[in-house]
Regions:
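Structured mid-to-C-terminal alpha-helical surface segments
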Residues: 1-41, 51-59, 63, 67-283
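Helix-turn-helix
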Residues: 48
Length: 283
């Protein structure tokens, strides 16, 4: 398996250690799909973009999950340890003794728990990180989806996953909350990819935005959020952060001003529709 993964990294021109970490994460998620615990989690985050798009989207070191129930560190530790002992024919071995759980505080108005642990594929070591949030609403409902494996010939993973609409809604919420302090350039890159894909239903997106903002207690902006305005794109720090993000991840991307302009044009009417939904719900 290690040799096959190394060949894949070379063929893609990717860093082997990053791909190994990705493989370790993928196979731990596969063990989750074999466990009764699968009903307690929904997959979200950057891994979904590799499901939705044919070409690799952007490098990611972790998996993001929505967990149901209380944000209890000991319960999460027990859950992850139980996954480590599930056998699968993929070469991965996980070390339950290396597991660490810590509270994470996101930049925006919500947090969660982070689980990190080590694993081995043959003699190669990898690091696995799961970031688990709690309490969010998923609109429309999560659907069970097959996640194709990195390597052919090994079992695929079936898990419930976020819809595109809630992915957009949560990133927009962070954009509103953080305003000019937003350093999450990956969100702009992800949103632009979803905009260009053109598969998001406008009515569902408006409903997801209204529901997400209500659940997180974030007031819907009366106009465009600062993160979608000229003030944001002309800020020298933001432009530098965008350039650094694109360069570090070796991405092909438009300039920040073009990305923000296109996102503003796309999201402005949807935000207006979300405001009408929110007003009708709470007159």
């Amino acid at each position: 398996m290690r040799a096959r993964l190394l060949a894949l990294a070379q063929a893609r021109g990717e860093d082997f250690s990053l791909l190994l970490n990705r493989y370790g994460t993928e196979r731990l998620l596969h063990r989750l799909s074999l466990s009764p615990l699968r009903e307690r989690f929904v997959l979200k985050g950057a891994l979904l973009f590799d499901l939705w798009f044919a070409a690799p989207h952007r490098p990611t070191r972790d998996a993001d999950l929505l967990g149901f129930g209380p944000a209890d560190a000991e319960a999460l530790a027990l859950a992850v340890r139980s996954l480590c002992i599930i056998e699968a024919d993929d070469g991965m071995v996980y070390d339950p003794a290396s597991l660490r759980i810590e509270a994470i505080r996101a930049e925006a108005n919500y947090g969660g728990l982070r689980a990190t642990l080590g694993g081995t594929l043959g003699r190669a070591r990898c690091a696995v990180q799961l970031d688990v949030g709690f309490g969010d609403v998923v609109t429309p409902a999560a659907t069970e989806t097959e996640l194709p494996p990195l390597l052919s010939g090994i079992a695929a993973t079936r898990l419930r996953v976020y819809p595109r609409e809630t992915v957009v809604a949560e990133k927009l919420d962070a954009m509103v909350v953080l305003a000019l302090g937003n350093s999450r350039m990956k969100d702009y890159y992800d949103l632009d990819a979803l905009r260009r894909e053109g598969r998001i239903d406008r009515d569902l997106l408006a409903a997801a935005i209204a529901a997400t903002f209500a659940r997180r207690g974030t007031p819907l902006p009366t106009g465009l959020p600062l993160g979608l305005t000229e003030e944001f794109v002309t800020d020298s720090v933001k432009r530098a952060q965008w350039s650094a993000f694109v360069g570090k991840n070796r991405l092909q991307a438009a300039e920040l001003d073009r990305v923000v302009h296109d996102l503003a044009e796309w999201l402005a009417p949807v935000l207006e529709q979300a405001r009408r939904l929110a007003a009708a719900r709470d007159p």
